[in-house]
Amino acid sequence: MAFNFAAILAFVSLAAVTSAAPSKTTCSNGVVVPDAVCCDFVPLASALQSEVLMGDCGEDAHELVRLIFHDAIAISQSMGPSAGGGADGSMLIFPTVEPAFFPNLGIADSVNNLIPFLSQFPTISAGDLVQFAGAVAISNCPGAPQLEFLAGRPNATAPAIDGLIPEPQDDVTKILARFKDAGNFSPAEVVALLASHSIARADHVDPTLDAAPFDSTPFDFDTQIFLEVLLKGVGFPGLANNTGEVSSPLPVTDGTDVGELRLQSDFALARDERTACAWQSFVNEQEAMATAFKNAVKKLAVLGHNRNDLVDCSAVVPVPKPATGTPATFPASTGPQDLELTCTTEPFPTLSTAPGAQQTLIPHCSDGTMTCNSVQFDGPATNFGGADDS
């Protein structure tokens, strides 16, 4: 009998591939995932929305997005493992330590809001909870990308040391060095991570202001932040001479409708020759910005871990709300004459200007009202210290 060795080898190879293929599991919501562990996050997403986020890209969402960065960046290649474990949930495991550090002022709110979920979902680690909660939170913001989420981070065994969180008064050289030491982030990746400032607000940079936005559209994940930081400053939304703050182009405040607050670090990164072109490249480039942010967070979220040890549960991350489709626009009272451009190798896009001779107030709440829905659980974390870079 003649044997077809090519056919036999093909069959054996196919059998090997088939046997090595990961099994699939269908979760209760119909989502197919590579591992049953991913299904634990389906009810967690629902609980986060119903108990904290309420489907809104509001203050609670902003704070959870901030937490994914502050937890993960606390790691150092030069100082070694004793400095911090990166994306390990140490903020939640040691809530009386890291939230009290100077750069983490305000982080206690999101820490206390997440701590109850550790007992409610005991199979989910603190590190996974922090990263997943941030992914769920940003999905409420129109235009945001669907973030990758990998599960399986072990719980932190020690808190990170102080001094690893970049601060808004830091110069560009110090900021870039901190990111390189944390995880070999390039200057362009640092800028990409700052797309989160499109939905960020500050509570403590100016002690007289609550929820001061960084751009005029703080409830949309859009490129407006990259335009407005390039405009010349004309005033402050509250007090002047605050550490880490420089004048902004849209400072008008009326009650709880707080004017735009500009971080010194954003101002500097937008104008430094090492980062200016990356910054400018995102103006009116929604898809490019969202993709770059997703890729940078993908790197941030596994600091301190080996990707191969984790399970890809991205399928259970909610699909974000679609972008509004509104192009980047010069706010009323501003225009091309107000641009302060350092990057000369790339043309600046042609943009329209919103009508009006005076600044339009920036709404305090996503629905335009003065009183926003917000949740704040009691907990062990307390706020001390200095500037909040949200």
From Swiss-Prot:
SUPFAM superfamilies noted in UniProt: Heme-dependent peroxidases
CDD domains in alphabetical order: ligninase (cd00692)
MF GO annotations: heme binding; manganese peroxidase activity; metal ion binding
Record text on cofactor binding: Binds 1 heme b (iron(II)-protoporphyrin IX) group per subunit.
Active site: H70 (proton acceptor)
Binding site for Mn(2+): E59, E63, D203
Annotated localization: Secreted
EC number(s) stated in the UniProt entry for this protein: 1.11.1.13
Similarity field: Belongs to the peroxidase family. Ligninase subfamily.
Protein name per Swiss-Prot or TrEMBL: Manganese peroxidase 2
Organism expressing this protein natively: Phlebia radiata (White-rot fungus)
GN (gene name): mnp2
